[in-house]
Amino acid sequence: MPRYRAIAEYYDHENERLDWLKRDVPFLLRHLPRRPQEVLELACGTGRAAIPLAEAGHHVVGVDYAADMLRIAREKRDALGVSPQNLQLLRRDVSRLKLRRRFDWVVILFNTFLGFTTLDAQDRVLRVVREHLKPGGRFWLDIFQPNLPLMASERSTRIDPSAFYVPSLARTVYMDVDVRRDPSKQLQEVTFNYKWFDQHGQPRRQRTRFDITFIFPRELQILLERNGLRVRKMWGDYDGSPLGADSPRIIVMAQPA
């Protein structure tokens, strides 16, 4: 995704404000067996999930296409003393991945799957998942559940004003997000706007845009089934509550059919 290549240095710091991102990995870890598992994380980014999975004793392969994100992940891994043998980081296109090995678990977190906005792209990713799972393996997918009142609105909105400090750049960055929705296409255009001040006090700006789709629970189940994956369980939040109409998340554990 282009935005991650553009602002990788911001990524961890801008997301510290999101409380739910402190709960998704612990919830996943509670469902992994205690004995070491072979785990493939697709779109691992800066290692936010891959590193704690490896620290818990699992053997993790993290894949991402953004070289700068992987650079930060390697720096964090090495600083924490996590062995490259326990956490291997690869630059690959996750929709065309061929590792010639299979895993106990394949995971896609943090709404990443929604960045694949066409049926063809979604099918390609799910085929990759199926091809890399061992018989009886598990697929873990975590996306937000669509908010129908928001989906019905085509107007642009500006949300999430915030500020964060980036130590590597010695810079405080001010951020807000523009969102434009097209319910007829189930698409959402998201633009992140960043502003900071240079050493002369002059404002500098950066903007990056990407599209995501909306997927409803039944749609997701159909997508999984037509790609050889059977849903074992669905949750609606990280407290383990079942998926319902008002649930904020769609968390799925599936396995090869």
Residue ranges and their predicted role:
Residues 1-45:
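Conserved class I S-adenosyl-L-methionine
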Residues 98-105:
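A short acidic, Gly/Pro-enriched loop at the edge of an enzyme's catalytic core
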Residues 211-257:
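C-terminal lobe and adjacent flexible extensions of AdoMet/dcAdoMet transferase-like proteins
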Residues 143-221:
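SAM-dependent methyltransferase
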Residues 123-135:
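A short glycine-rich, Lys/Arg-flanked "PGG" loop and its adjoining helix->strand segment in the class I
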Residues 136-143:
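Conserved beta-strand signature within the Rossmann-like core of class I S-adenosyl-L-methionine
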Residues 50-96:
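Class I SAM-dependent methyltransferase SAM/SAH-binding core
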